[in-house]
C-alpha cells in the first residue's frame, strides 16, 4: 500500500487535533478533542499531561476512521504544539510527577522576580533572545522541582525527564525510545543558547536544572524514531517533524526567505519575521527565537505579540452587544467611509510589543455627538491593524529589513475590511491563503520533507495557494495622518493611569 499521507498533530491550549494531509498539501480529514483546563489558584493554569496524551490517541483514531485511511498509508507524523507548556515525568513508569504547567500560567512569578533581583536579565537576553517572564518553560520546570517532594534529587539521578509538549508526545508515541525536542521548542525554555545551539551551563545553573533530565535537541525536520505498533494500529510510522505552533505557522505560510513575515490573528496576534541565518537582537522588546532547523542549518525569527486582537471583536459582541456575531463587524465597518477620528486603544490587559506597558488600560478617543456604533466598530477593527504596524515597524527597525508582503492567517483574517485596512496602513500588500490551517500545514510539511513526500522547500511553496491579495489603496499622506492619530491615542491612554 502506497504511503502518501502525512498525519499532523496539533496539540493546542484547549484541544488536540489530528489532520491528514495529502501530497498536494490539502487537508483530507480532521478530528478534534477538547480537554479540561485546571485552575488551582487565580492566575495558575494547568493541564493533565495524561489527559492530553489520551486526547491525542483519540484524535488519531478519529481521523483515520473518519477518512477511511489505513495506518499503513501514513508516511510520517508531524507535531506542532502549544509552546512553553512544561511536563516532568518519571523515566521508568512514564507517569507525570505533576500537572503540565501551561504557557499562560503566572505561578512562577516569584522565581522570575528572584532572577531579576539577581541581575540575570542581560545574561538571559543575550543567550536566549527571551525576557524573564513566567511564560517560558525553564521557570516552570524549576517550580515543579521545588514543589514535588524529592523531585530535585531524583532529577539529578536521571530518574526524571523534562519536556515541552512536543517532547512528551514523541516520548509516548515512540514508547520511550526518543527523548527529544526541536530547535524551535528548545528556544522557548530560557535554558537553551540560541547562538551556540546547546543547553547552556550557566542558564542551567541559574535555575538549578539538572542536565540529565533534558531532551536532545534535534532538527525540526528529521526522522526521530518510529511509533510503537500498539499506539498506531500495529504500524511503525516515523515521527519526522516538530515545530512550536507559531514557528509552524511561519513555515506553513511558506515564509522561507529572509524578511518574509506572517501575522496570526487569534485572541491576540502573533507576528513572526524570518531573519534568515542571522539572529537579530531586538532593541524594541521583541523576542529573538529559532524559527526551525533543516538541512544542517538553523534559521531565526523575530517575534512580537499583541495581547488583544480577536478578543476586542468578542468584546464588541459579548460585552457591548454591538454585533450579534463577530463576522457582522465587517458589514458595519464597511458602511462608512472612515471612523471619523475615533480611536479605540484595546489595552484591556496592558499593551504588548513594542510598548510593554502592563498598567495601561483600554480607552476610546475622538467621540462626538455624531459618533454611531459603525464608527466605534470600525475603530476597534482598525486598532488591530495599527498594533500590527507598531510591531512590524519595530521588526524593520531591528532587522534593517523592509517588509515586502504580510501573510495572514487566524480567525480575523477572514474579515475583508480588516485585511484591506491592514494593507493600507502598512503600505504593503497582504496575502491570505486558501488554507487557513497554516500551523498544521507547517508540521505536515516538516514531516513530509523528512520522509520524502516533498523534495524541498521549493516544492512546498507550490502548495501555498492564494485566496486573496489585498493591494494598497490608501495615499501615503492619509496613512501617516491616521497612524499619527493612533500614536496620540496610545500616549493619552498611557498618561491616564
UniProtKB/Swiss-Prot annotation:
What protein family is recorded?
Belongs to the FGGY kinase family.
Q: Which residues bind ATP?
A: 13-15, 267, 310, 314, 411
Q: What CDD domains does the database record attribute to this sequence?
A: FGGY_EcGK_like
What does the annotation say about its assembly with partners? Homotetramer and homodimer (in equilibrium).
Can you name the source organism? Answer: Listeria welshimeri serovar 6b (strain ATCC 35897 / DSM 20650 / CCUG 15529 / CIP 8149 / NCTC 11857 / SLCC 5334 / V8)
Q: Which gene encodes it?
A: glpK
State what protein this is by name.
Answer: Glycerol kinase
GO molecular function annotations of the record:
ATP binding; glycerol kinase activity
Q: In which pathway does it act?
A: Polyol metabolism; glycerol degradation via glycerol kinase pathway; sn-glycerol 3-phosphate from glycerol: step 1/1
Tell me the function of this protein: Key enzyme in the regulation of glycerol uptake and metabolism. Catalyzes the phosphorylation of glycerol to yield sn-glycerol 3-phosphate.
Amino acid at each position: 500500500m502506497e504511503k502518501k499521507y502525512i498525519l499532523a498533530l496539533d496539540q493546542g491550549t484547549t484541544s488536540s487535533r489530528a489532520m491528514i494531509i495529502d501530497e498536494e498539501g490539502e487537508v483530507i480529514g480532521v478530528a478534534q478533542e477538547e480537554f479540561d483546563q485546571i485552575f488551582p489558584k487565580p492566575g495558575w493554569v494547568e493541564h493533565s499531561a495524561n489527559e492530553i496524551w489520551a486526547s491525542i490517541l483519540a484524535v488519531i483514531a478519529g481521523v483515520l476512521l473518519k477518512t477511511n485511511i489505513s495506518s499503513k498509508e501514513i508516511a510520517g507524523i508531524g507535531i506542532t504544539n502549544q509552546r512553553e507548556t512544561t511536563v516532568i515525568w518519571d523515566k521508568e513508569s512514564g507517569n507525570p510527577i505533576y500537572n503540565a504547567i501551561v504557557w499562560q500560567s503566572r505561578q512562577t512569578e516569584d522565581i522570575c522576580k528572584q532572577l531579576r533581583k539577581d541581575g540575570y536579565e542581560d545574561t538571559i537576553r543575550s543567550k536566549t533572545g527571551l525576557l524573564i517572564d513566567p511564560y517560558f518553560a525553564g521557570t516552570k520546570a524549576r517550580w515543579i522541582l521545588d514543589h514535588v517532594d524529592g523531585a530535585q534529587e531524583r532529577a539529578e539521578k536521571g530518574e526524571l525527564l523534562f519536556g515541552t509538549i512536543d517532547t512528551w508526545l514523541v516520548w509516548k508515541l515512540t514508547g520511550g525510545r526518543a527523548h527529544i525536542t526541536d530547535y524551535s521548542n528548545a528556544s522557548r525554555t530560557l535554558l537553551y543558547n540560541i547562538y551556540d545551539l546547546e543547553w547552556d551551563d550557566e542558564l542551567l545553573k541559574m535555575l538549578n536544572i539538572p542536565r540529565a533530565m533534558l531532551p536532545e535537541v534535534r532538527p525540526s525536520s528529521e526522522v526521530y524514531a518510529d511509533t510503537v505498533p500498539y499506539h498506531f494500529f500495529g504500524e511503525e510510522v516515523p515521527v519526522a517533524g516538530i515545530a512550536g505552533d507559531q514557528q509552524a505557522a511561519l513555515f506553513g505560510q511558506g515564509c522561507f526567505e529572509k524578511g518574509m513575515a506572517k501575522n496570526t490573528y487569534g485572541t491576540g496576534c502573533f507576528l513572526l519575521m524570518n531573519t534568515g541565518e542571522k539572529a537579530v537582537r531586538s532593541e524594541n522588546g521583541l523576542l529573538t527565537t529559532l524559527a526551525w532547523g533543516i538541512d544542517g542549518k538553523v534559521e531565526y525569527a523575530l517575534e512580537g505579540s499583541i495581547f488583544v486582537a480577536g478578543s476586542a471583536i468578542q468584546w464588541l459582541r459579548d460585552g457591548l452587544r454591538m454585533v450579534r456575531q463577530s463576522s457582522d463587524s465587517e458589514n458595519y465597518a464597511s458602511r462608512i467611509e472612515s471612523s471619523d477620528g475615533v480611536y479605540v486603544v484595546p489595552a484591556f490587559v496592558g499593551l504588548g510589543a513594542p510598548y510593554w506597558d502592563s498598567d495601561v488600560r483600554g480607552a476610546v478617543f475622538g467621540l462626538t455627538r455624531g459618533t454611531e456604533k459603525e464608527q466605534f466598530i470600525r475603530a476597534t477593527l482598525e486598532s488591530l491593524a495599527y498594533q500590527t504596524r507598531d510591531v512590524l515597524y519595530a521588526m524593520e527597525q531591528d532587522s534593517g529589513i523592509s517588509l515586502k508582503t504580510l501573510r495572514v492567517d487566524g480567525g480575523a483574517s477572514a474579515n475583508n475590511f480588516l485585511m484591506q485596512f491592514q494593507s493600507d496602513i502598512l503600505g504593503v500588500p497582504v496575502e491570505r491563503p486558501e488554507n487557513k490551517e497554516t500551523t498544521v500545514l507547517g508540521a505536515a510539511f516538516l514531516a513530509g520533507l523528512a520522509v520524502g513526500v516533498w523534495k524541498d522547500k521549493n516544492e512546498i511553496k507550490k502548495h501555498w495557494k492564494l485566496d486573496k491579495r489585498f493591494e494598497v489603496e490608501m495615499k501615503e499622506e492619509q496613512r501617516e495622518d491616521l497612524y499619527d492619530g493612533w500614536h496620540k491615542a496610545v500616549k493619552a491612554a498611557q498618561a491616564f493611569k
